Every structure is written in C-alpha cells, then in structure tokens.
C-alpha cells in the first residue's frame, strides 16, 4: 500500500520528476548482472495536485527492472506527461512487466503507455484506501 501526493503549489528542481521510478541495474551498466529488480506493488495511488510541477512519468520502469503493479490509480489536476513509461536509453523495462492502472486526470497525458510490457489502462482501479493512513492525521 502506498500513496504519493504532490500538493497544490509543489515545485520540483528535478529535470524529470516522477511518481515512482524503478531501475534494474546501476545506470544501465550491468544488464547481465543477476538478479535484476523484480518487485510487486499492490494498491498504489499517485496524485498530482500541483499546477506548477509537471510529473514527467507517473510510473517509470527501466534498465531491466521487472514490475508487477496491481490496482494503481493516477489522479489529480496537475500535468502528467506519461502515465507509464517502460523505455530508457540505457535499457528498457523487462518485457514481462505487468501493470494495471486507472487514470483520473483533469489534463490529458501525452502518452498512456510508452514501451513494451503488459500494461492495462482501464477504469475501475481504486488505488490504496486513504483509511490505511488515518493514523498519520493527513487530510486527503
């Protein structure tokens, strides 16, 4: 379970800020190294409420990483360029990457999916329940 939010007014000094980023090997220099990253995320929400910061990729998997992402939701009023990006100049995501994501964005993305993998973009995913984080006192 995870929830990432860029609040209204958030700015970033990064060249290519992302919601989640996963690499399989150090800077693409070890594609033959084993094991590579192979992980699962279940029940994830990424929310961009900032009109000042453009999220380059909501989900970026690259350089040999293999991801299984289930019940992901990307939402908000801020700009997200790529919903899911599986390509990189130093190595793409593992082709067996599987992602199920819904989007509730008020602005269109340039690309829903960039790269090769088993990515499903469809309505119906709920992401993580905010009740999970009630103990923090954060007001969603």
Protein language model regions, located:
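Extracellular beta-rich repeat passengers
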Residues: 1-140
